[in-house]
């Protein structure tokens, strides 16, 4: 987006309001979502989380040993490809994080919208990563993982529940179980968690979701294809 334009102003205000550490607009559920999918580098990480979800939803599908190997290879491959795509994009465009924009750079955008103003005391709800914002790694990993699992199962419509693997790191997540009616719903929630957490712009999420799905579609069509 043009940082002086209305689309940027809307995204700036959205993350400023919802993603602040002391936000009064973020709901309890949105706060839970931000923590549930945080998956920082000191824990399971997003690729590890989606490998765990894959194991959970595939374990009762009566897969053979070879089918299991194929599934894990495809899912692992797409997670690796997602990281390459996302981080290549991050350092190609070098877009600043919301926390930097809100605390330091807002006046430089020359945006006439009064919502685009500097707040030196603003803090993100979850820790802001130390690398560029665009696009979202979380959203790329999530979309790629969910799409590949859907390819393997032949459907996106999977009802499942899941507990966070980061309960030691985030004790507030103990006994918290989240429920979804589709794999894509879980992937979108995973990506939106970064807006609720104050570390990504909405555009980071939306573009990354499309990239992740494309990565999975390409890998499924070309690699480890079943023998007829």
Language-model features: where?
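Acidic/polar surface patches and capping/hinge elements
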Residues: 1-228
